Structure formats: C-alpha cells, structure tokens
C-alpha cells in the first residue's frame, strides 16, 4: 500500500528500501530510503476518518507556530498518507530533556488564555476528540476528555455500572481536585513514543492531538508513562520555568485517566491492564 500511495504522489521512483517501524497502533509507519540516500517517514492508514492526517498536519503546524517546539517538516498529506521528514529515535541526554522542558514551558506560557478547546475537532487514535469551546476547564475536561469515552462500544462492553458512576463522581468533583489554571496550547498525547530527535539531539514532537487546555495534561502523559532515566531533569526544569500549582504530582494520575479511557474505548477487553489501572485511579470515587 505504501508504495502505491507514494507513486500516486509522484514519489514512488528510485526507492532503494522500505522498513516498517515499530509503534503506530493506528497507522502503519514506514521509513522510506531513496537511491540517493534521502529518507522520509510515510504513515499510511485504511478505514480511518478522511481528515485524520490533515488534522495531524494542522496540529504539527500549530505547535511549530509557537516558535518554541520543534516538529518534523510535513512533506505531503492525503487522506491515506502523511509524508514527514525523517528524524532519529529519541535520545537520552539530560541536556536534551532540559532543553525540551524549556521549549515546552515557553510554548505553554506564550499561549495562555481563558478559552478551552480548538477551532476544529481532532483525534486521539482513531476516535474523535471533541474540542468545542468553553471557558470552563473543568467542564471541558469532564465532558470532552472523560465522559465522552463512556459511550464508545468497546468501553460499554467492559466498564461496569459502578465504573461509569465512579467516572461521573470524579467529574463532579473536578473543581475540588484540579485548581483553576489557564488554557494553553497542548500537544495532547505527549508520551515518549511521540518524541523523536533532531541530528543535534533536540527533542522533537510528533503525532499531536492538540487543543487549548491545562498545561498539566501534557505533563501527565510524560509523568505516567515509562520514560528514559535522563528525563528526570525535565520535570524539575519545567517547574522552575512554568511552576504548576502546589500538589501537581498528585494530580497526574487523574489527568492521565483520559488516556486510559481512550485505550479502553479503542481496545476494550484487549486492554485488561489499562482497565485495572483505571479502576485503581477511580477507587476513591466508587459508591461505598
């Protein structure tokens, strides 16, 4: 498929090799090497929304437009193919992570405002991410980042009535748990699988799910997922430059619940460990 899509773009000639890369649970990701040594990344997808890659390209442009975050150059975009500049895998140096903290903190600070949402809906995986504008961060996160996944068929199959009620109780208490914070431009899916490196080692973001919401949403993805040892410097450096309200580390699991519910909504019973983690986070909110 990838060769057919490249040929349709006039980029199918003199290809020396194709290599399928790891990751990419939604799209297939390929490293394309041409005879002259040039390399590009090609993402292909079938059966997804026709604007999936266009939304991704727009998100990369928005992040790059802050003037602080590095993104790969978008070379071409169609309904079934996204062609990107090829970059190196994520490195693991304290200097790179500290610079990334500066980049992300500056991007968050420079985009702060009071409206939550985005001009268009996006995607987290294959599922639509609703970005309807609101001035309430608690309402935005409750309605569009937590409750919206409960009605997905895969989630309905595995979440019990008690699970659903616990999510609803958590949403009702969000104003007690999450302090008022401004809306900033967030990457939206900022785990290490969506980070690569430029030749000089600068950390570069890929695969965004952008929206204007709390900065801590981005932090929660990095905090709650496995990460390289050198990344420990990231959190200290970020807090020096863009301090979160006190108790930020304790809020990370709550904010990361959005990711767990998304995984359940995509994979249902095929993600038992995620279901267990979700219930651990929700434990204080089950009826007693």
Describe the role of every protein-language-model region:
Residues 19-139:
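ATP-binding pocket architecture of kinase catalytic cores
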Residues 67, 108-115, 153, 178, ...:
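A general structural signal marking secondary-structure boundaries and capping sites
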Residues 1-8, 112-186, 198:
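An alpha-helical support segment within catalytic cores of ATP-dependent transferases
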Residues 233, 263-288:
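ATP/Mg2+ or Mg2+-diphosphate-binding catalytic cores
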Residues 137-142, 151, 181-185, 192-253, ...:
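Active-site Asp-x-Gly
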Residues 83-85, 258-265:
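Conserved PLP-binding active-site segment of the aspartate aminotransferase-like
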């Amino acid at each position: 498929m990838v060769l057919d899509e490249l040929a349709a773009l006039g980029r199918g000639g003199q290809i020396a090799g194709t290599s399928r890369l790891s990751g990419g649970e939604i799209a297939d990701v390929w490293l394309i090497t041409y005879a002259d040594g040039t390399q590009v990344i090609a993402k292909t997808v079938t059966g997804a929304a026709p604007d999936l890659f266009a939304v991704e390209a727009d998100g990369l442009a928005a992040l790059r437009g802050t003037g602080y975050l590095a993104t790969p150059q978008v070379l071409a975009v169609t309904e079934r193919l996204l062609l990107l500049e090829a970059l190196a895998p994520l490195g693991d140096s304290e200097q790179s992570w500290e610079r990334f903290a500066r980049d992300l903190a500056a991007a968050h600070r420079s985009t702060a405002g009071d409206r939550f949402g985005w001009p268009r809906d996006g995607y987290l995986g294959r599922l639509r991410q609703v970005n309807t504008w609101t001035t309430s961060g608690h309402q935005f996160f409750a309605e569009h980042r937590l409750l919206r996944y409960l009605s997905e068929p895969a989630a309905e199959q595995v979440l019990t009535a008690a699970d659903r009620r616990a999510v609803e109780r958590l949403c009702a208490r969000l104003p007690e748990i999450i302090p008022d914070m401004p809306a900033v431009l967030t990457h939206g899916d900022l785990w290490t699988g969506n980070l690569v490196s430029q030749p000089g080692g600068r950390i570069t973001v890929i695969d965004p799910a952008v929206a204007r919401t709390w900065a801590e949403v981005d932090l929660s993805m990095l905090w709650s997922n496995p990460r390289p040892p050198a990344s420990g410097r990231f959190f200290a450096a970020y807090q020096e430059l863009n301090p979160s309200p006190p108790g930020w580390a304790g809020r990370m699991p709550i904010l990361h619940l959005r990711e767990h519910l998304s995984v359940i909504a995509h994979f249902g019973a095929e993600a038992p460990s995620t279901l267990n983690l979700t219930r651990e986070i929700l434990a204080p909110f089950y009826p007693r």
